[in-house]
Amino acid sequence: MKVKNVKPYKRRSLELIEMAIDMTKNREYQLAREYTKLAITYSRKFRFKIPIEYKRSICRKCYVPLVIGLTERRRIKNKVVIRTCLLCGWVRRYELKRDSKEGKGIPPRHKNRQERTQ
């Protein structure tokens, strides 16, 4: 089934995720879990991507929004961010971004490298 207008579903999905984050802050984890499952179902059914900042804020095992201090623990070790869900124990690791000026596609032996990276 091809849906012509996906925008209302995408907007509703993002609203559901934001409501789920609010429910998590109020410690209503079951309701927050239902909201995030519904938002993910919308994105799969109507074929749109959930933005990465929302996608990374949801536990992939128990579908609870990750809020630092309530449902998530963050640690940084060796330039890697380690995120742990405090409800189910799910662990995810993300590399920290490198310095954006250094690797802009300029070879190390280029004659103007110093000028371009400053």
Swiss-Prot record:
Entry's Gene Ontology cellular component terms: cytoplasm; ribonuclease P complex
Catalysis: reaction(s): Endonucleolytic cleavage of RNA, removing 5'-extranucleotides from tRNA precursor
Known cofactor(s): Zn(2+)
Keywords noted in UniProt: Cytoplasm, Endonuclease, Hydrolase, Metal-binding, Nuclease, tRNA processing, Zinc
A Pfam match: Rpr2
InterPro entries: RNP4, Rpr2/Snm1/Rpp21
GO biological process assignments: tRNA 5'-leader removal
Gene3D superfamilies: 6.20.50.20
Residues binding Zn(2+), per UniProt: 59, 62, 85, 88
Manner of cofactor binding, per the entry note: Binds 1 zinc ion per subunit.
Location of the protein in the cell: Cytoplasm
EC number: 3.1.26.5
GO MF term list: ribonuclease P activity; zinc ion binding
Protein purpose: Part of ribonuclease P, a protein complex that generates mature tRNA molecules by cleaving their 5'-ends.
Family: Belongs to the eukaryotic/archaeal RNase P protein component 4 family.
Oligomer status and interactors: Consists of a catalytic RNA component and at least 4-5 protein subunits.
Cited HAMAP family: RNase_P_4
PANTHER family in alphabetical order: RIBONUCLEASE P PROTEIN SUBUNIT P21, RIBONUCLEASE P SUBUNIT P21
Name of the featured protein: Ribonuclease P protein component 4
